[in-house]
Amino acid sequence: MTNLTLALDAMGGDYGPRITVPAALQALRLYSFLNFYLVGNKTDIEKYLSQVESDVLRRIEIIHTTEVVTMSDRPAHALRNRKQSSMRLAIELVRDGKAQACLSAGNTGALMAMSKVLLKTLPGIDRPALVSCLPAVNKTPVYLLDLGANVSCCSETLFQFAVMGSVLCEAVDKNCSPKVALLNVGIEEIKGNDQVQQAGQLLQQSPQINYTGFIEGNDLFSGRVDVIVCDGFVGNITLKTSEGIARLLVHQLEKGLTKGFFVRLMAKMIAPRINSVLNQMNPDHYNGASLIGLRGIVVKSHGSADESAYLQAISLAVTEAQRRLPQMIEERLESILLDINN
């Protein structure tokens, strides 16, 4: 297995090194080919390394900085004034070819702004998109993009998102022909605004994309399609609503299983099955959103992620780096555009 190096913004997120460093250590024990740059305050990071075995420790290099991007920093401010921040230095390691992917749980807007400026977009891609997974009834995750990187999009941008989402699904899930749909207010061809309708027409002209038409919100988790495309305004609200509903259902189920002797007894008897269902519904199981369309790999973790959830995001970054996702997107987009022009 070829060695991989990830650059980790160790100070990002609600808990900083208290979560990011132990999760990185878990990943190093899980992947023998993995190395880390841990970017952040050396003193804070080393608190979590004192008891670490030597074979793991030698695969870590600390890049010291005391500057951080705060959650209240506006993207433009962070771009201009946080040039020595842990987030920026981590992205620069990818730009300079020292790391194959960057991971941060920090300020999403700042991460997107810095990534776009430092890494640049791929040829043929106007804007990067934020993409993550939703659970589905058939247990195969559904990719949803954009999740907030672009609050409004033209039809060409939505088309590019569809291409990138399709390639991501191929790369991560090894799905050779992912089904792609546009999120809309109805499935009829006459429904939706001009941007969505025109994006649908572009996708219909692309034989390399398995475009299935429009999909409504009530079909998000049906597993009928593999990739769902929308603008960032719709996508962000959809994702946050889905996560809220999932947490509500998990809470209500856990609460209900503690009421009454016979209910508790039955719950113990079927505990493995219950835990499996709860795990599938838990948003932490799907932690890790990819900022795709860039010349390098950037993965965003939830700021509130615990150690297990953060490890999920690291694993996603590892998979994308192994599959060389940016190169796959670039090659596929070039091929698709050539098909359309011919």
From Swiss-Prot:
EC number: 2.3.1.274
Chief subcellular location: cytoplasm
Keyword field: Cytoplasm, Lipid biosynthesis, Lipid metabolism, Phospholipid biosynthesis, Phospholipid metabolism, Transferase
GO molecular function: phosphate:acyl-[acyl carrier protein] acyltransferase activity
Highest taxon above the source species: Bacteria
Entry's Gene Ontology cellular component terms: cytoplasm
Keyword Transferase: yes
Catalyzed reactions: a fatty acyl-[ACP] + phosphate = an acyl phosphate + holo-[ACP]
Role description: Catalyzes the reversible formation of acyl-phosphate (acyl-PO(4)) from acyl-[acyl-carrier-protein] (acyl-ACP). This enzyme utilizes acyl-ACP as fatty acyl donor, but not acyl-CoA.
Alphabetized PANTHER family for the sequence: FATTY ACID/PHOSPHOLIPID SYNTHESIS PROTEIN PLSX, PHOSPHATE ACYLTRANSFERASE
Homology family: Belongs to the PlsX family.
Quaternary structure, from the entry: Homodimer. Probably interacts with PlsY.
Protein name: Phosphate acyltransferase
